[in-house]
């Protein structure tokens, strides 16, 4: 197998994709044979799990780029006391041609804007949720019974088409995976010409969760609002 190295052209492709994430607290360090995603301590202290979830979006982007470059990504989540800032490391695995779906997801990286959203059908939400492939994560359609619990977390989903991203636990690794699942589902929506907007959820103590009439599944990490893009109304002069 021919070894993969991040040369000038592949770095340019990756750089263009990462720039499209917009403001991001995660730093991508591109080495010859790997990409190291780090969470700067100064930003981590201020942003809590938001920086890790944004590292997840960067992870999803690196994954997408490696696939169109014809490589299977290999992801590691090191627990290194000497480098506590490292969120994930991505290396290029064996060669495999990208599928048409993966090319579509790569193209969709350019279409992740956040306009006003008009609700979509449950069938659309179900199709998007089914495309999540990140381990130890789930993407579910928000049920009416979950609305009060989400409101306690400061999220208003009334009249919106929403998906809930959860993880099996609440470690640093799971925050990164949640961010990857959130970003990957946004790509799936963009491929279908739907717009989306991510909403990060604060951590909720177990005691508070136990008081809810219908407990949210897993560990809630983020919401994804999905819809048809509508133009923003201009304010009257």
What are these regions (language model features)?
Residues 1-237:
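Acidic, surface-exposed loops and disordered segments
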